[in-house]
Amino acid sequence: MSIKHWPEQERPREKLIQQGAGALSDSELLAIFLRTGTQGISAVELARQLLAQFGGLRSLMSASREEFCQGLGLGDAKYTQLQAVLEMSKRHLQEQLMRETVFASAEHVRTYLSSQLRHSPREVFAVLFLDTQHRLIRYQELFMGTIDAAAVYPREVVKAALQYNAAAVILAHNHPSGIAEPSQADISITDKIKRALDLVDVRLLDHFVVGDGLPVSLAERGLV
């Protein structure tokens, strides 16, 4: 049955207007994004099938272009639309945090880093550069690929910190597997970067590992 024949309170768009986006299921939110279904399949049913195919919303949103376009009813138009929505969300959150004290609590940092890194299909090493009040000066993704001593150069972090006149930095990287447990390589590179930053009087406040769930803080584990 077409969605237009559903009771009004069950239609995703009307439900969002009446109850807010938080009241919608993943499939209902995705149905609004899709707008239409395919022949004989409503947008909500198509959304359910896609979530089952990709293994959930996270996997769908972080899929590569090739993987995404293999989904029923999906193509380049929907892929570019999704990327635009994700980028707008990132920029909106960054604008908010530019006006706030980033390190007022670790939760501010966790929220921001989750939005930036959780959906990336590859490993990304990023740095938050902060002023003396711990306000965000700049977020920059410095390295891509496997995070180890050969891929991350402490001097590049120091160079960028001096360029932005940062008083402190927060490191972050994601684990595309979704498992946010820090590795020995993560701990080792954190120590190397901390010692390099100490030489130029820039504080390393923390290093977060982003996966599914809450990002893990190395500082909270006594590893910074």
UniProtKB/Swiss-Prot annotation:
Belongs to the UPF0758 family. Residues 102-224 form the MPN domain. A motif (JAMM motif) lies at residues 173-186. The keyword Protease applies. GO terms for biological process: proteolysis. This is UPF0758 protein Mmwyl1_0624. Transmembrane segments: none annotated. Zn(2+) binds at H173, H175, D186. It comes from the Bacteria. Keywords: Hydrolase, Metal-binding, Metalloprotease, Protease, Zinc. It comes from Marinomonas sp. (strain MWYL1). Signal peptide: none annotated.
